[in-house]
Amino acid sequence: MFRGKKYQEAAKLVDKTKLYDPEEAIDLALKTSYAKFDETVEVHVRLNVDPRHADQQVRGTVVLPNGTGKNVRVLVFAKGDKAKEAEEAGADYVGAEELVAKIQNEGWTDFDVCIATPDMMGLVGRLGKVLGPKGLMPNPKSGTVTMDIAKAVKEAKAGRVEFRLDKTAIIHCPIGKVSFGKEKLLENYRTLMDAIIKARPAAKGQFIKSITVATTMGPGIKVNPLKPL
């Protein structure tokens, strides 16, 4: 794959044979950021589990202390008092049948987080084929099927991120923007990694195989998986 001159210059700063500690890795990610826009800093964690087995799934949510720097668009499926609660908490879209119809008929998914009250799941369940592949389906495990709508909306807006394994046993998660600076990014990174470690299933051996930190356009920087925090 051909990479541009700026990428190649940035990549020269990274020792591909070295496993960095988290602070060094984030510092280097900032130094190798060269895009004209405010790049997102991402963490990619490869785990020693088999995602094909239900008892080895790793997923959860965590509120990053400094947010993600992204304007999070929240949709809530609710009626009556819970719909009002969602609106007052700052949800961008609130509704029931009409929103289900819009998603079903138009394939509309211009939102980042989808929350529902438990009584709405019979209706929302019809949207599995649209919302499921995009990771938007409300789920009790991730706190997005709940009666505490206000809390869920506020956490989503504040920078709650959901992490889950992909088919290759890797978790991909943003921890903020380059403009955050090293200290805020490091705090977000440690909060995320702590949550992933706590979500460990009963698998034997070394849990974390590899950790890579990178900006949107920059090179990957490897973190020592034996010292993830």
UniProtKB/Swiss-Prot annotation:
InterPro entries, sorted: Ribosom_uL1_bac-type, Ribosomal_uL1, Ribosomal_uL1-like, Ribosomal_uL1/biogenesis, Ribosomal_uL1_3-a/b-sand, Ribosomal_uL1_CS
GO molecular function, one term: rRNA binding
UniProt-listed CDD domains: Ribosomal_L1
GO cellular component: large ribosomal subunit
Keyword RNA-binding: yes
Keywords recorded for this protein, A-Z: Repressor, Ribonucleoprotein, Ribosomal protein, RNA-binding, rRNA-binding, Translation regulation, tRNA-binding
One of the protein's GO biological processes: regulation of translation
Listed Pfam families: Ribosomal_L1
Domain of life, source organism: Bacteria
Subunit structure: Part of the 50S ribosomal subunit.
NCBIfam families on file: rplA_bact (TIGR01169)
Role summary: Binds directly to 23S rRNA. The L1 stalk is quite mobile in the ribosome, and is involved in E site tRNA release.
Similarity-based family: Belongs to the universal ribosomal protein uL1 family.
Official protein name in the record: Large ribosomal subunit protein uL1
Source organism of this protein record: Caldicellulosiruptor saccharolyticus (strain ATCC 43494 / DSM 8903 / Tp8T 6331)
